[in-house]
């Protein structure tokens, strides 16, 4: 909205031409989302406390988590509010890729909200049954990937780019929707599994989103993409602003979610933000780079898969003390802040490796 207003004023006031630049609007978007998060955070926390929407803690988990019982959750609503407000203010709303990404994010947030509402308000311990959660995630993903597939007007739209190789691409053709579906649903659930400690998930989300914003910016520019040897994907520049909004909103949320957390994001936040990372990676054609940068989410998910599989086929034995992996280290005696910071450090390494693919080809 403000971007549209600045467009009208450019003819009379040359200073407003600065709003044409993605970099400038990205900074403003990030700051806007940060301010919305910081200002609305206390109001959201008080409101959730008033509704008695508090976290339920597993009795079989680390005993240190028992003190978290009753901590307000569903704070992901605050993150989504900050992202949406920021995008509406600073994005060029004529770009369809922005609306696709934003709608996929909010739709997955709605699925998470229903799950949280059933668990925390209706006191249904199972929340939204797994099969229904997966069903609605699948519907959202299939609608999104079908739109992308049927509107693919350039070869790059269905090509898989292999990191570290300048000329290695695979034309997925009819298999593009399959890959895209698993990226969206998989990313959404992987982030959800990681969100188990104070601030553990949100900081990696911020780092990966920021890096994806760099890819979105470079991919939308023919000169930069040619120089870096990455796919040129027209009309995706506004996703830089979307990613910047995630960065700002995430940092604003971390202010209240850092240890000891005053609020948790809940499924409404984790499912939405995971899906956001997935759909952005698909649109800018960097699915494999997301796999690298989101390595922490991959490791956490694999720990659950391995734990369940090993338990099933070994007759009840466990590979880890507890899954996801962050709980394993807690039960080994690591303090919660130590687990969190070390997992953040791991994410920094993964994100740097992903960014290295911009030049190492």
Curated annotation (Swiss-Prot):
GO CC term, one of those recorded: plasma membrane
EC id: 2.7.8.13
Biological or metabolic pathway of the protein: Cell wall biogenesis; peptidoglycan biosynthesis
Keyword Membrane carried by entry: yes
Primary localization: membrane
Cofactor names: Mg(2+)
One protein family per Pfam: MraY_sig1
TM stretches of this protein: 27-47, 70-90, 97-117, 134-154, 167-187, 199-219, 236-256, 263-283, 288-308, 338-358
GO biological process: cell division; cell wall organization; peptidoglycan biosynthetic process; regulation of cell shape
Membrane topology (UniProt): Multi-pass membrane protein
Location relative to the cell: Cell inner membrane
Annotated keywords: Cell cycle, Cell division, Cell inner membrane, Cell membrane, Cell shape, Cell wall biogenesis/degradation, Magnesium, Membrane, Metal-binding, Peptidoglycan synthesis, Transferase, Transmembrane, Transmembrane helix
Enzymatic class: transferase
UniProt-recorded Gene Ontology molecular function terms: metal ion binding; phospho-N-acetylmuramoyl-pentapeptide-transferase activity; UDP-N-acetylmuramoyl-L-alanyl-D-glutamyl-meso-2,6-diaminopimelyl-D-alanyl-D-alanine:undecaprenyl-phosphate transferase activity
Superkingdom of origin organism: Bacteria
Reactions mediated catalytically: UDP-N-acetyl-alpha-D-muramoyl-L-alanyl-gamma-D-glutamyl-meso-2,6-diaminopimeloyl-D-alanyl-D-alanine + di-trans,octa-cis-undecaprenyl phosphate = di-trans,octa-cis-undecaprenyl diphospho-N-acetyl-alpha-D-muramoyl-L-alanyl-D-glutamyl-meso-2,6-diaminopimeloyl-D-alanyl-D-alanine + UMP
Family to which the UniProt record says this protein belongs: Belongs to the glycosyltransferase 4 family. MraY subfamily.
PANTHER family in the cross-refs: PHOSPHO-N-ACETYLMURAMOYL-PENTAPEPTIDE-TRANSFERASE (PTHR22926), PHOSPHO-N-ACETYLMURAMOYL-PENTAPEPTIDE-TRANSFERASE HOMOLOG (PTHR22926:SF5)
Function statement: Catalyzes the initial step of the lipid cycle reactions in the biosynthesis of the cell wall peptidoglycan: transfers peptidoglycan precursor phospho-MurNAc-pentapeptide from UDP-MurNAc-pentapeptide onto the lipid carrier undecaprenyl phosphate, yielding undecaprenyl-pyrophosphoryl-MurNAc-pentapeptide, known as lipid I.
Name the record gives this protein: Phospho-N-acetylmuramoyl-pentapeptide-transferase
């Amino acid at each position: 909205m403000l971007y549209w207003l600045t467009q009208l004023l450019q003819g009379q006031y040359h200073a407003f031409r600065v709003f044409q630049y993605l970099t400038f609007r990205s900074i403003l978007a990030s700051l806007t989302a940060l301010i919305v998060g910081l200002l609305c955070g206390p109001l959201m926390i008080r409101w959730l406390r008033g509704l008695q929407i508090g976290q339920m803690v597993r009795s079989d988990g680390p005993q240190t988590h028992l003190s978290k019982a009753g901590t307000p959750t569903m704070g992901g609503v605050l993150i989504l509010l900050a992202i949406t407000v920021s995008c509406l203010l600073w994005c060029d709303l004529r770009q369809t890729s922005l609306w696709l990404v934003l709608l996929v994010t909010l739709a997955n947030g709605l699925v998470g909200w229903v799950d949280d509402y059933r668990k925390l308000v209706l006191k249904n311990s199972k929340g939204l049954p797994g099969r229904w959660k997966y069903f609605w995630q699948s519907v959202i993903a299939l609608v999104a990937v079908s739109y992308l597939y049927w509107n693919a007007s350039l070869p790059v739209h269905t090509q898989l780019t292999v990191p570290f190789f300048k000329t290695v691409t695979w034309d997925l053709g009819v298999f593009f929707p399959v890959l895209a579906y698993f990226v969206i649903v998989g990313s959404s659930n992987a982030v959800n599994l990681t969100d188990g400690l104070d601030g553990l998930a949100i900081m990696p989300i911020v780092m990966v989103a920021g890096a994806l914003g760099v890819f979105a910016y470079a991919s939308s520019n023919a000169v930069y993409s040619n120089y870096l040897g990455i796919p040129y994907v027209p009309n995706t520049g506004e996703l830089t602003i979307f990613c910047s909004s995630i960065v700002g909103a995430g940092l604003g949320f971390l202010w209240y979610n850092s240890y000891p957390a005053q609020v948790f994001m809940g499924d409404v936040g984790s499912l939405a933000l995971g899906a956001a990372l997935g759909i952005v990676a698909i649109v800018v054609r960097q699915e494999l780079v997301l796999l690298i940068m989101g390595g922490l989410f991959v490791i956490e998910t694999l720990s659950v898969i391995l734990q369940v599989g090993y338990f099933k086929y070994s007759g009840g034995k466990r590979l880890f003390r507890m899954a996801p992996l962050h709980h394993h280290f807690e039960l080994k005696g690591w303090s919660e802040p130590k687990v969190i910071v070390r997992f953040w450090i791991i994410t920094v390494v993964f994100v740097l490796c992903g960014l290295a693919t911009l030049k190492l080809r």
